């Protein structure tokens, strides 16, 4: 038995498991500059208050059991007074996906690329399922104006006091807001639910709406920064920060 265990361990050592890819960036941010996060593929996006004058960004990536992590693309740029961080997946590299070989068991993952019909994408190539797990952790100065969007990930924001616009197609949006900081609110979902702290003064509440709509309200008497949270099919939460 000991000899068998030794052989097994030796075999595993000879073929190490691929590790998750971790990408980290730090960027200087001057006072008054805005931040745009366009994080298309995502599972969870966590944004928290950090140090003044700096944005820290971390992405933890696993694509097809870490065999296609090189398909993850990160771009950082500046446009006027805005720092822009964008992520995507390289379509050409995704064509190397091999669910039949166990990279994405059952081929049940999502396909990220052009539209396709009958198993082929817009360029006539056969599409393959891609198993993607990507988490982001972002820290920025508390008063920074932020725009963040994603295809299907959950967005969680806490500790910020500047204007916020957060949108996801099918995930949840969860914002914890400081109790002493006033805000103008717009909370919207089409097929999910909007949950707002009882202290929010709702301006256009509807009872038993047939379809989703934009709920508008104020926090702390209003007059503060604009806060817009939106999900197409997920839930939207506005909470008082504890």
Regions flagged by a language model, labelled:
Residues 4-13:
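Sec-dependent N-terminal signal peptides
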Residues 15-19:
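Sec/Tat signal peptide C-region and signal peptidase I cleavage site
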Residues 20-79, 175-177, 228, 233-242:
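Short linear S-[DN]-x-LW-Φ motif typified by the pepsin-like aspartic protease active-site region
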Residues 22-28, 58, 88, 159, ...:
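Short, surface-exposed interaction patches in beta-rich subdomains
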Residues 30-32, 40-42, 50-54, 69-73, ...:
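Extracytoplasmic
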Residues 33-35, 43, 136, 144-146, ...:
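The right-handed parallel beta-helix/beta-solenoid scaffold, focusing on the short coil/turn
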Residues 61-105:
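Mid-chain, structured segments of secreted extracytoplasmic proteins
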Residues 89, 98-129, 197-217:
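Acidic/polar low-complexity surface segments
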């Amino acid at each position: 038995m000991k000899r068998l265990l030794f052989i097994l361990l030796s075999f595993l050592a000879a073929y190490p498991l691929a590790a998750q890819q971790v990408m980290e960036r730090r960027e200087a941010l001057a006072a008054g500059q805005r931040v745009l996060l366009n994080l298309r593929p995502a599972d969870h996006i966590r944004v928290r208050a950090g140090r003044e004058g700096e944005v820290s960004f971390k992405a933890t990536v696993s694509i097809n059991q870490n065999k296609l992590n090189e398909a993850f693309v990160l771009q950082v740029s500046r446009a006027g007074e805005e720092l822009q961080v964008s992520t995507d997946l390289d379509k050409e590299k995704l064509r190397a996906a091999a669910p039949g070989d166990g990279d994405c068991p059952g081929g049940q993952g999502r396909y990220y690329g052009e539209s396709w019909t009958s198993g082929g994408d817009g360029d006539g190539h056969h599409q393959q399922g891609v198993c993607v797990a990507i988490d982001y952790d972002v820290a920025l100065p508390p008063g920074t104006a932020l725009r963040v969007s994603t295809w299907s990930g959950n967005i969680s924001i806490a500790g910020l006091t500047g204007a916020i616009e957060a949108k996801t197609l099918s995930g949840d949006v969860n914002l914890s807001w400081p109790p002493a900081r006033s805000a103008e609110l717009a909370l919207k979902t089409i097929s999910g639910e909007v949950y707002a702290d009882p202290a929010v003064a709702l301006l256009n509440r509807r009872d038993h709406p047939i379809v989703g709509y934009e709920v508008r309200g104020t926090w702390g008497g209003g007059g503060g920064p604009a806060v817009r949270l939106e999900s197409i099919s997920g839930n939207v939460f506005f909470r008082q920060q504890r």
